[in-house]
Regions:
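Acidic/histidine-enriched alpha-helical segments
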Residues: 265-267, 338-355, 551-552, 593-596, ...
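Patatin-like phospholipase
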Residues: 2, 11, 29-85, 95-400, ...
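C-terminal segment of classical bacterial N-terminal signal peptides
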Residues: 20-29
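Gly/Ala-rich beta-loop-alpha elbow adjacent to hydrolase catalytic centers
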Residues: 86, 90
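A generic beta-sheet turn/junction motif
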Residues: 197, 371, 417-419, 624-628, ...
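C-terminal outer-membrane beta-barrel translocator/porin domains of Gram-negative envelope proteins
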Residues: 410, 423-425, 435-447, 474, ...
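Gram-negative/organellar outer-membrane beta-barrel architecture
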Residues: 393, 398, 410-576, 651-657, ...
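Solvent-exposed coil/turn segments that connect beta secondary-structure elements
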Residues: 102, 111, 194-197, 207-209, ...
């Protein structure tokens, strides 16, 4: 609902809706799910002489935010609401109101919520573990496809897992509320979802209220379905768009129905396939609504806010407009609504009580763990201890950190009462496309003058391989620098404080030599294979120190240049120390935080190396945002401190942040140093991915001898660029220039700090 579905998602949606329609046409289906218990809907004001009044709030995505002003009008007129049933967005608004939230609170929540962030499951980079942060350097992204041991190929059921959406529902309804019957809420409530296996409506009348809301809003192909009591549930709008039958089954004698569904379009022969698919899905949802509305009697009322095409299903950023339209509809319906007034006029101004349940003291913690992670590992993310009060805010933050494992479809908790005691039940479910997750990536550098590097990457992540979260990854790279590598990462404790990593494989790199005018005159190809191993001490998700060793063998040959230069074989063996301080929000468009890397590499003959030398590497970056503006500062210092580094160990420079007036990897040397300052302006942000324009000033150089390094020998570089953090990687178009040379145009994909 947060975004306009893609063509593939529309096809999935229409297929699901069609399947549902084949089995859900009969009206009594929803009523059959909930017993016609007229005691659910009782006169809350004690006035048994009047009829019981129920609300049926229809689905419609962002259009459903107009429900709030309808509710506010009922309060103003003093119309009692005895029970509520809601579908999709109607379940969102209805559940908040039924749980005791005032209309002012609900309105404030929908106006202040960052809906783009809510519908973006990605955990902010600064909150991820160091392991997940390090994956940014692999330039790989999960594509929603994987391999399962029981079913072969697995495909993610939706684009979004709805983690932040569920957290919003928990905050909105009171996370500390003990699960139970929805009849026990301040206003009895029902949420309507759809059984994915039958297409029939499922009326949820007990359990976790936030999970009921989440199930009712599980739009097919957009959100992952929800598992509840043996059923897999989708959005309720698929089967019961306006739950009039449900609120009637609760015992309502007079019904106020609110229809916020999207009307059918008027198409002609030029209609696109996307428009046709929209129309097909519209047939099903509007048909469901029409069948429900036909059951209304002369004492009932339907209100249709005139949303037209001004507020679409995914237009959550238009909350203020939806509220305004809802107010107009409520005002227009006022004469008809007056027939629902039974209380004295003075009662109309009495505010509704807003019971806020206190965070309960926890007596027990249960976990239903469907993953291969250890129970204790998952619980270590959640600050819940028997004998202490539940901290709902900390629980929500811990759940979001647990999603940082990258392999969970859901991790939820429910406050339950057992044997007179209150406790927490945690349920963890793995992604359906695991435990072998397919990944893909693309890196590109092109100066539009014939110098380009392109690498296509495909990987498989196997996770978890141990209760503590061991992982393995195999990566195949094709293109300018082909390779086949593998890694095994093994934590030794729950907190991932101590871990080991073993990497190995084959890699090929090119080293280019350019003349003074920037034309390539030579290119060397370096092929190497070998293995490295490290032990890490992780102090937090920000700081890590590692020690290790590496052993490689390979060869260097000329691809462009003097054919008389013979191929040379080499042997590499070194011990290494690395330290990382990583608290930056992005490696590609940094706006806040710091990043520092330090490394020592000692090549030794007793490790099998041809040459003995030592290298010191240090990089530091910082970024700070001011609204849409951000500034960046950085410096790098890399030297061969002793000995002579061979060709395979020299440094490469060129490109944005690395002397942008040079082509990618144009500069080579055994030593280099640079400083830079940058500025970016965020043009837009969509589902956590931003489009930015900016520029850099850079000063530095590369040298063959350390004695030649001199501040006055640096070269001033500058660049301006525009970029977008796309789903295939950060794509950047820019112009780089340096003193004493012509400007170059560059295109980069997947290049970062």
């Amino acid at each position: 609902m947060a975004t306009k579905p893609t063509l593939r998602q529309r096809l999935c949606l229409v297929a699901g809706l069609c399947a549902a329609a084949c089995v859900s046409v009969p009206l009594p289906a929803a009523a059959q799910q909930a017993s016609a218990d007229t005691t659910s809907c009782i006169q809350r004001d004690g006035n048994l002489a009047r009829p019981r009044i129920g609300l049926a709030l229809g689905g419609g995505g962002a259009r459903g935010m107009s429900h709030v002003r309808i509710l506010k009008k009922l309060e103003t007129l003093g119309i009692p609401v005895d029970c509520i049933a809601g579908t999709s967005a109607g379940a969102l608004i209805g559940a908040m109101y039924a749980s005791g939230r005032s209309t002012d609170e609900i309105e404030q929540l929908i106006l202040t919520t960052d809906w783009k962030d809510v519908f973006n499951d990605a955990l902010p980079r600064r909150d991820r573990s160091l392991r997940r942060k390090a994956e940014d350097t692999t330039r790989l992204t999960q594509v929603g496809i994987g391999f399962r041991s029981d079913k072969g190929v697995g495909i993610a059921a939706g684009v979004s897992e709805g983690a932040k959406l569920l957290a919003l529902f928990e905050r909105a309804t009171g996370s500390g509320r003990v699960s139970g019957r929805f009849d026990d809420l301040p206003i009895p409530f029902r949420a309507v979802a759809t059984d994915i296996n039958t297409g029939k409506p499922v009326v949820i009348d007990h359990g976790s209220l936030p999970m009921a809301m989440r199930a009712s809003m599980s739009l097919p192909a957009i959100f992952q379905p929800v598992a509840m009591e043996g059923k897999i549930l989708l959005d309720g709008g698929v089967s019961d768009q306006i739950p009039i039958d449900v609120v009637r089954a609760m015992g309502a004698q007079r019904i106020i129905a609110v229809d916020v569904g999207t009307p059918l379009s008027v198409l002609d022969r030029s209609a696109s396939i996307v428009e046709v698919l929209d129309q097909l899905s519209g047939f099903l949802t509007t048909g469901s609504a029409a069948r429900q509305l036909e059951t209304l009697g002369p004492d009932d009322l339907v209100i249709r806010p005139d949303l037209d095409d001004r507020v679409a299903t995914g237009d959550f950023q238009k909350a203020a407009l939806a509220l305004e339209i809802g107010q107009a509809a409520a005002d227009a319906a006022t004469p008809a609504l007056r027939s629902f007034v039974y209380a004295p006029p003075a009662h109309a101004t009495t505010p509704r009580p807003v019971p806020v349940p206190p965070d309960p003291e926890i007596a027990f913690v249960h976990i239903v763990n469907h993953t291969d992670y250890a129970d204790d590992l998952l619980l270590s993310y959640l600050p819940v201890t028997p004998g202490q009060r539940l901290d709902t805010g900390a629980m929500q933050a811990g759940i979001m950190r647990a999603y940082g494992l990258g392999t969970l479809a859901s991790i939820t908790y429910e406050v339950k009462r057992e044997n007179g005691q209150v406790g927490v039940e945690v349920v963890a479910t793995p992604k359906p496309n695991g435990p072998a997750y397919l990944e893909a990536g693309l890196t590109l550098s092109n100066d539009l003058q014939g110098n380009r590097e392109t690498n296509l990457r495909a990987g498989v992540l196997f996770a978890p391989l141990s209760p503590y979260g061991a992982e393995a990854r195999v990566v195949l790279q094709l293109g300018s620098e082909p390779g086949l590598t593998g890694e095994y990462y093994h934590p030794f404790d729950l907190a991932n404080r101590y871990a080991a990593s073993v990497q190995g494989g084959y890699q090929s790199r090119s080293f280019n030599v350019f003349d003074a005018q920037g034309y390539q005159v030579e290119r060397y190809r370096l092929d190497r294979y070998g293995v490295s191993a490290f032990l890490f001490r992780n102090f937090s998700n920000v700081l890590s120190i590692g020690v290790g060793a590496e052993r490689y063998a390979g060869s260097a040959r000329v691809e462009i240049g003097d054919p008389a230069v013979r191929r040379e074989d080499f042997q590499d063996g070194a011990v290494r120390v690395v330290a990382t301080l990583d608290d930056i929000d992005s490696l590609f468009f940094p706006r806040d935080g710091v990043l520092a890397r330090f490394g020592l590499r000692g090549s030794r003959d007793w490790m099998g190396a041809d040459a003995e030398f030592d290298q010191i590497d240090f990089d530091a970056y910082a970024a700070k945002s001011f609204g849409r503006h951000a500034v960046q500062l950085g410096s790098s210092y890399h030297v061969t401190a002793s000995g002579e580094a061979p060709l395979q160990s020299i440094y490469r420079l060129g490109g944005r942040w690395r002397l942008a007036g040079f082509q990618h990897n144009q500069l080579t040397g055994k030593h280099y140093a640079l400083v830079f300052a940058g500025y970016t302006y965020e043009l837009a942000n969509f589902r956590g991915r931003s489009a930015q324009v900016g520029g850099t000033l850079e000063y530095g150089n590369a040298w063959q001898r350390r004695s030649d390094m001199d501040l006055d020998d640096g070269i001033l570089n500058a660049s301006v660029f525009i970029g977008f953090d796309s789903w295939i990687g950060p794509l950047i178009f820019g112009i780089g220039d340096r003193k004493g040379s012509d400007p170059i145009i560059f295109v980069e994909l997947g290049q970062g700090l």
